[in-house]
């Protein structure tokens, strides 16, 4: 027999939960969101099923996580993925209505608690590229690509984005995230209306996650005296790009070309720079940047190094690529009611964090 015609039989053992709990898993990712963790979350949020039937609460949590990982698929097809490797086991075959009822029965509380446990810094003390001068670099950014069905209730809650030529076709959610720039690991997330032009409104809900030892990178959408003062009040240091309309007072010049100023009593250092970007075709684009920072020591944090650091803020933009690319593939989110949108942050975030923790499946 020719060698290229030879065959090999591969068998493997799969360990799953017993009985009606068997569909509750995420395959290889289950080790990062184990049964014990999910059961503890259900106990804490008092969402354990009262009677053990075909769809227990633990199975519901993993089903909702799978919905976040397969946003293009309907309920039945996502359930089929959870049960595809369970041939020979007496697993339930629920209707889509039963799965919708399971989702409503759980509510957002267990998913929110699970997200808060899983989200957090991923970098180890020895990880390179996650610190600047001993400070952990993090960044805020908003994603406005999450459209919801155009119903009266959704328009009342979210409004619609207004453009020069009219209103957007669908009400839109804003997903505000706080991420570690070196690993793109989520530290927290919050949902709000994209019709509110002020991104800082949603970002304020994430300020309790900041603490001394952090350096927050902000784009010019967050350049407001009140918000910058609130960030500084957490003990974290900040580096923000100023709007083109801001012209700070000069209180004193520093040897590296930066100067001192203040914003409503907040002492800051201003760094001005002109950046030239060269494209692959040789074309050049120039832009002027005015950076606001509370890194006051120009010897420890020289202006050229701070300007180079600001580029790291784009890491959170890359982290948002998954949300933008997946949401661009379909018209709107699957839920038609406000309560359903509150599930968005939790299953998607926890699933993404689990996938990032296991590089082979990222």
Give the ranges of each region predicted by the language model.
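Long amphipathic N-terminal alpha/beta scaffold segment
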Residues: 123-131, 147
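Generic beta-strand or strand-like secondary-structure segments
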Residues: 81, 98-101, 117
